[in-house]
Amino acid sequence: MSGAESYRHITVLLNEAVDALAVREDGVYVDGTFGRGGHSRLILSRLGDAGRLIVFDKDPQAIAVAEELARSDKRVGVVHGGFASFQAALDGLGIGKVDGALFDLGISSPQIDDGSRGFSFRFDAPLDMRMDTTRGMSAAEWIAVASEQDLHEVIKNYGEERFSRQIARAIVAQRAESPIDTTRKLAQIVAQNVRTRERGQDPATRTFQAVRIFINRELEEVGAVLPQVMCRLKEGGRLAVIAFHSLEDRIVKQFVKKYSQHAPLPRWAAVREADLPELPLKIVGRALKPGEAEIAANPRARSAVLRVAERTAGPIPEQSQRKTSEWQ
């Protein structure tokens, strides 16, 4: 039995995230990160016969589960691909506006715990790290050709690793002797070049995170999908995003703030804030984190943050609509 099959996947902030969508029985909803379908199944339980749920995932294993669900529930539509193709995928399915969209960002427990996927330094496996194993460059292939500067920048920017330059230099030196094609080889190089260890954290944690984020274009896709969702939400529709680390949460937070709050007016301004045009989003509640009971049951939930925004009647700036074209 593989790690993906043996690990019991626990959906993070299950009720809180679906509650945030305020699901209507006849609504159209999107689960942008199907995983093993925890959020999707709860959404379906609240939809009536006329409702629809479109699910996205890159991972072929997740898509297999989603397609099995779709065979038994005609309300479900499945998209094998990243959520950055949000608008194009909806167009292909003949769907216009939607009532809500949910994104549970980052890597899933089945992906981490399946040693063969190459996401974790806990297993010695081929260094792959692709969420979609059917396309794109693997981590090993990229590490084999990336320049020392590119390695440094990825590890520094996506892993926030203080020793990124030393790690990059060591990778280049080692690959000149033999390929760095397994998780163990990469983890050993990192361990030899991280001078101080963070309490309770393996020295390879930040580097593995950085390479995974880069290989899967995780941050670019988050930045790309948010304006697309804003364009497709009906008035009153909800966007709910669960982030697990500061890089992706910062993107979500800044996006929602930009389109829900006017910049402060100077004291000498002749116009009042109340006279400014309505913005396209409004923040719903405060950022929500898992409670102690959920963290005790699922320690991986500890860093999760849920942010929710609602579409208003405010117009969407033209430049935001243009930004979505790259991913269509």
Curated annotation (Swiss-Prot):
Residues engaged in binding S-adenosyl-L-methionine: 37-39, 57, 83, 104, 111
Any one GO molecular function term: rRNA (cytosine-N4-)-methyltransferase activity
Keywords: Cytoplasm, Methyltransferase, rRNA processing, S-adenosyl-L-methionine, Transferase
Catalytic EC class: transferase
A Pfam family reported for this protein in Swiss-Prot or TrEMBL: Methyltransf_5
GO biological process, one term: rRNA base methylation
Main location: cytoplasm
UniProt-annotated location(s): Cytoplasm
Reaction equations catalysed: cytidine(1402) in 16S rRNA + S-adenosyl-L-methionine = N(4)-methylcytidine(1402) in 16S rRNA + S-adenosyl-L-homocysteine + H(+)
Cellular component GO terms, alphabetical: cytoplasm
Record's keyword annotation contains Iron: no
Enzyme Commission number(s) from the entry: 2.1.1.199
InterPro entries referenced in this protein's UniProt entry, alphabetically: RsmH, SAM-dep_MeTrfase_MraW_recog, SAM-dependent_MTases_sf
Lyase is among the record's keywords: no
Protein family: Belongs to the methyltransferase superfamily. RsmH family.
Function summary: Specifically methylates the N4 position of cytidine in position 1402 (C1402) of 16S rRNA.
Protein name from the UniProt record: Ribosomal RNA small subunit methyltransferase H
Classification of source organism: Bacteria, Pseudomonadati, Pseudomonadota, Betaproteobacteria, Neisseriales
